[in-house]
Amino acid sequence: MAIPVINAVINFSTGPSFAQAMILDTGVLDTNVLADSTAIIVDVSNRVNRIETNRGRTALSDQFQTGALTLRIVDQNGDFNPQNVSGPYYELLTPMKKVQITATYGSVTYPIFSGFITNYVTTYPDESGEDLAITTIQAVDAFRLAQLAQISTVTGATAGDLSGTRVNQILDTISWPLSMRDVDAGLTTMQADPGTNRTALAALSTVASSEYGSLYVDATGSFVFQDRSVTAGSIGGTPTVFADNATGIDYFDASWILNDVLIFNKATITRSGGTAQVASNQDSIDKYFLHSYFLDNLLMQTDAVALDYAQAYVASRAETSIRVDSIVLDLYTDNYNSGIIAALDLDFFDPIKVITTQPGGSTLEKTLQIFGVRMNISPNSWKTTFTTLEPVIDAFILNDTIYGTLDYNVLSY
């Protein structure tokens, strides 16, 4: 049975880039990055004891969160113990060094996590009850760096900038590499930057919210900004089908849920310097009671756009239905080639359809989007969990059998 090969690499160079340094007359153009010396990069793949990654968006905060990694490596010689003064990397074992996890399967290498080390903890057999000395490395993705960076003035951030332009201006302010960005142009024009003291992450999140788009860090370590047209339209792609009745990729477990977490039937959206714009759905309020949503100090230029936001939000959230909360894939399942590829390749906003057979023979079927990816990997186990949610914003999608129904789907702004 073929299983993906884990690659775990610690990069002791400075700066945000995960690439090897470019050395004149030696380096490879379009592969290495320009630097003054070779980065010390250590492959710890053959020492891996366990890997846990968690990236995604939470339903309650309605935003993507900082991704996290726990990497446990066998460390019998204390090479990665920062207290070992005779260790080969002693002076290099400091916080914010880079770590990257990938998986190779069928000659394709898939990114799993790229981030920055926050701490090292070494435990010994007599302390942990294990037979081996283990160093546990914990890391976070680039959201943490943006959260740590305080900014005020954003150069060039004038009224009329599209949201994507503003995102790039903020990333320029913290000197984030151009090669580590995937930024859509955006549809909403911004006010001039307020110039207040805040974190870069707060500034980026305000722009993303003003656009009604999405901001996250992908598995390669790049900042990704999607405008609302991409966010809304991505559900219209061809879904990967997971089913327990042989009509799709088999899965280990699927958790179905029906609750009120995603219901919002009144939204109050206020732009900076504007008046509160309110939208509500009385039928939903009568049915579910009042579920309110507030967002203020946004940067769209007009109250009309703020009202569009409020109306689109309520139209997308006034109703709910049974949905798949999460689906688990076991990569050690026999004859699981398609499942392994899906587990490694699918990521945020990818549409999936889940089919579950109920007692009595009826089926539950739902098409949703992936908004969270969690992996738990050990020498004899590999499970990938996708958390799923309804689209961030509903939109009418032409020729789509689910999101292209007149009198049912929403015309977005």
Per-segment meaning from a language model:
Residues 1-159, 169, 191-212, 217-219, ...:
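Assembly/oligomerization scaffold segments
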Residues 62-85, 183-230, 234-237, 241-413:
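An acidic/polar, Gly/Ser/Thr-rich interaction patch typically located in mid-to-C-terminal regions
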Residues 94-98, 160, 347-351, 355:
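Glycine-centered loop/turn motifs
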Residues 131, 135, 163-166, 265, ...:
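Alpha-helical structural motif
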Residues 145-149, 178-183:
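Short acidic/His/Gly/Ser-rich catalytic and metal-binding motifs that mark active-site loops
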Residues 162-175:
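Short, charged, amphipathic alpha-helices and their helix-cap/turn boundaries
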Residues 174-178, 361:
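Short secondary-structure junctions
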